[in-house]
Structure formats: structure tokens, C-alpha cells
Amino acid sequence: MECLIIAEDIIQKVKDLNDIVDIVSEKVKLKRTGRNYSGLCPFHHEKTPSFSVSQDKQIYKCFGCGEAGNVITFVMKTKNFSFVEAVKYLADKVNITIDDNKDKYYAKNKEKYDKLYSMNVEAARYFFRNLDSNSKAKKYFLDRGINQKTMRRFGLGYAKDDWRQLLSFMKSKGYTELELIEAGLIVQKNKAVYDRFRNRVIFPVFDYKGKVIGFGGRVLDDSKPKYLNSPETKIFKKGTNLYGLNFAVKNNIGDTIIIVEGYMDCISLHQYGINNVVASLGTALTKDQAKLLKRYASKVVISYDADTAGQAATLRGFDILREAGFDIKIIKIPDGKDPDEFVRKNGKEAFMRLVENAVSIIDYRINRAFENVNLKDSESVIKYVKDISEIIEELDPVEKDVYIKKISDKTGIREQAIYDLISTDIQKSGNNIEKMNKNSNYGQNLYVESAHVKSERYLLRLMIEHKDIRSYIESKISADDLIMESHKKIYNIILNFEDNLSSDLKSKFGFIESRCDDGESSSEIVKIEEQNIMLSENNVKDLVDDFITNIKKFRLEESKKKIMSEIKGLEEKGLFDETIELIKRMEEIQNQLDNL
């Protein structure tokens, strides 16, 4: 968890001494084309170079996928570093020393973070010692095949069935109730304070560096909730960590990671010597987890539970991992077992065979859909073919041929009929707004920005450059009204411009960049800096109003699409009465669109 801010002049010095052409060339083979350099984009698959690097401006831009940024952004995105990590990496290259403890440019709250880590370590030791004194808790792990060595390695423990045991212990170590509340170890309710975890086996949660950042606890009886996790704290953010990654990193995991759902799945596989395993801890893999994973691997094998929730999570996880650029395969475990059960019953070699035979997402979706098909029921077969046609219509011609033959073999429907169905679907979807439009002159895809994205950038550029216009924009639109999360962050940073901040643009953009701690925001601020807006005294407010209208229009159209989808789902189930309120809502949205 980064808690540091580096001064703008240090950041600028790091950028000045690291030529972007040199840094990009470590990853991309560049060729000089006029004043710029070009190569194959590292952020998306392409055969014709659309990635351009400007040595004069010290920025890069891909005309195929829209990625853009400076030398720091490039390091953040290609290495999945945070902003501070990227600056430190580049600083090391040019022998600039940045001292975590003494540098005056860092925020002064490191001591508070260190105390949170110390409290968690102390609590983890306490829980671990408790395990030996409670036979029921220890039996829980032993019954699941977890040996003493693994219990010690993962720091597994037990929280006693007592309201204030941990509280008393931690206070004896010198920690205050307020500090323990901030760490999420105790709860305050109706002026009373008590232990958060009681009568539960405990799983310490580590970050990728091996620091204890939180805990998960499972009940030993039928009480609810079955699992209880630490709340979010300054060092523990849900959806930004992967359980077991610290162990996986230590074991030379290679280029492939296996993702499972829960603590026990991860722990069991590690015990059986399968070390390239992490757990997403819940059914929803996040973009932040995918970014963290990208530092260590380019291939992912998903092994979620076989139940409905697990299958749904597999599909959601696939979309996020695909967006992050992973090569993805999916395991189907026989008999509906989870990874923990399977490896305990069948051993390491059997599980590794499942990994070797993992299938692509297309095969997974086709096979999953086929499970519910009744080949004797014509309607069931037709629905299956239509559903699958939507899945494969975006594949390249060779892949499409392969899957059409598979579907034809499964269903007995002629290949030509399936081709015709896909062609019809593609024609119907031709009216949809596409991000990628075909450039007939060059035979490559060019990225087309949406109107609302451009409008948000223009508004932010105006806010940065013109203080008087900033006030007008603030009165018309807030950060929450913006669509892109990175733009919301930049909007709020602009509102916090310091009074003594220089009025020149370079200082303002430097101030913002030093506070953009993620790749998307860092990339966006470079794009905003590149925007040029022609202004006259007469058209400023009209321009701003037009930009805001574009944003509102997009949000309303997205709401309309969502409601239309809900109406369609209800109608397919025959629930026509339930659609009445939704139809009224859609009419209201349409009226708002008409009045924009």
C-alpha cells in the first residue's frame, strides 16, 4: 500500500533523465519514421504498427487501441507498477536516490502505516498460538488434510470464543482502543468495544510482499456469517490483493498462475507442491487484482468452484483478465468438486492433468451451454445454436470454421445454416456504435474516441488552464457526474490545487501527475495535456454546456440500454406486469434525452 507523494521537481528530473525512446525500446522494437518512432503496440495484438513514440514530446500513443502516456505511464502499464514504484524504478536507472524514510518530499504518515502492519503481525502471532490450545479448531484443519508444516507456513490460527481476549492482549502490548479499531481488529458499538473475530479459525491475509494486512475468519459451528473478513483499512483494500501471491512469487512460478476462489483451495494446492496458485477470495475478480497479477504472469488458468456462482464468477473473471491482456484457460473439475476436494482425493498429478487439459473460454462457454441442451427438443437445440452463434461471431475466420464444425457435429445442424445465422447477426449489429472502425486505406483498426470521453477531457483541460472557467464548470457538474473513474480522480485533484501553486501549466500538470497513483489516471493526464481548445470570449460557456450535454446524453443512453435489457429479460419470462414501471422509467429517460 503506497502512502507516499513525490515532489513534482523530483518527478520532472526523473522524466528528463530517462529518454522515452530508450525505455520503450526495452519492450518494443522501434523504427524511426520521420521525427517519430513506430512499432507494434505492447498493449494490444496487432500485425501492422500503429504505436508511435515522440522523442520531442517524450510521449507515446497507439492509434489502434488509444493507449497514450509518458515514460512513467509506460513503466506503470507494462510492469503493472504503482506511480511511486515506477518513479523509483526510473530513478534507479539514472542514479537518483529517493529515501523512503528521510526524503522531505514524502508524506509524513509512514509511521501510522508501519504501526498498522505491526498490530496485524502481533494479532497473527496471537491467533497462531491459540490454535494449539483448541483441539476443535486444529481438528478443522487436520480433517481437511492440512498438516502442521502448512499451518505454520500460512500462519493459520484461532480466535477464542471470548469478547475481549484479543483486545486485552493487544492493550498489554501498548496499543490503544482507537488504534485497534482503525486496524479492524476490534469493533465499537453502542459505546462498547469487543473483538471482531470470535470462535473462528483464522486465515491471515498477506500482501504480495508478505506483510499481514488483514484476516479472514471461518466459524466452527452453524452461526452466521460463515466467513468474516477484516474491514477496509489504510493497508487493506478489498479487491486489490490476491491470497497466496506472496508464497507463489517466492517459488519461481514461471509464466502461468492458477486462480482459485477460497483460502482452503489455495492452501491445499500449495501443500501438494502446486505453488503457482492464488485465491481471489470471493467470486468477483477485480481489475486491480488482474493488474497486480500481470506483474508476475501472462497466462492464467481459472479453477473456480463448479456451482452456479463459481461458473458465473469464471465468466466475469475472464472478461477482466482478457482486458488486462492475459492468455486464459479454464479448468473443469469432474463431479462438481472444488480444487481442495479434488487434489486431496486424487493428488497432484491428477490436478496437473486438469491444468494441461484446460480449455479456452469459447470451449468453456460452448460446453457449459450444451449441458442444458435436450437434443430431442428442437426448440432447445435451436436456442443453443443461436446463443453460441453470438459467442463465435467475433472470432477470426479460421477459429470460426473450427467452432462451427464442432457445433454442427454436436447438434446435427448443417454448417452452412450456422454460417448464415452468424452473418445475419453481424448485419443486425452493424448499426451499433463501434469503438474500432476499419480504415480501408491501411487495412488496420483505428481507435475512435467516444464523444463523452473527449468532452470530459476538454472540461478538465479548461479547469486546469482557466481558474474562472473552472468555477463555472464546478457549478454545473461534479466529479460524480463524470463517467470515467480516472477523470473523477483528476477532477478532485484539480479542486485541491494549492494556493501557492504556480499559475504556469507545467506546474499544474506536474502537481496532478504526482497524485495520479494508477496507470489509467497517469495516462489520462497526458492525453488531457495534449488537448487543444480554440476559445473566444463569446463561446466559452456554450462550449462547456455542449461538453456537459454530451456526458449527460451518454449516461442517459446507458441507463436506457440497461432498462431495455431488463424489460427484455422479464418479457422472456412472461412477467409482463413487472415491465410497466420500467417502461414508464424508459419514457422519462427518453423525454430527458429529447430535451437536451
Curated annotation (Swiss-Prot):
GO terms for cellular component: cytoplasm; DNA-directed RNA polymerase complex; primosome complex. Binds 1 zinc ion per monomer. Binds two Mg(2+) per subunit. Signal peptide: none annotated. Its EC number is 2.7.7.101. CDD domains: TOPRIM_DnaG_primases. A zinc finger (CHC2-type) spans 41-65. It holds the Pfam family Toprim_2. Transmembrane segments: none annotated. The keyword Endoplasmic reticulum does not apply. Mg(2+) 1 binds at E261, D305. Mg(2+) 2 binds at D305, D307. Residues 255-336 form the Toprim domain. One of its GO terms (molecular function) is zinc ion binding. It is an enzyme of class 2 (transferase). It catalyses: ssDNA + n NTP = ssDNA/pppN(pN)n-1 hybrid + (n-1) diphosphate. Its cofactor is Zn(2+); Mg(2+). One of its GO terms (biological process) is DNA replication, synthesis of primer. Keywords: DNA replication, DNA-binding, DNA-directed RNA polymerase, Magnesium, Metal-binding, Nucleotidyltransferase, Primosome, Transcription, Transferase, Zinc, Zinc-finger. NCBIfam families: dnaG. Contains an N-terminal zinc-binding domain, a central core domain that contains the primase activity, and a C-terminal DnaB-binding domain. Monomer. Interacts with DnaB. Belongs to the DnaG primase family. RNA polymerase that catalyzes the synthesis of short RNA molecules used as primers for DNA polymerase during DNA replication. This is DNA primase. It comes from Clostridium acetobutylicum (strain ATCC 824 / DSM 792 / JCM 1419 / IAM 19013 / LMG 5710 / NBRC 13948 / NRRL B-527 / VKM B-1787 / 2291 / W). The lineage of its organism: Bacteria, Bacillati, Bacillota, Clostridia, Eubacteriales.
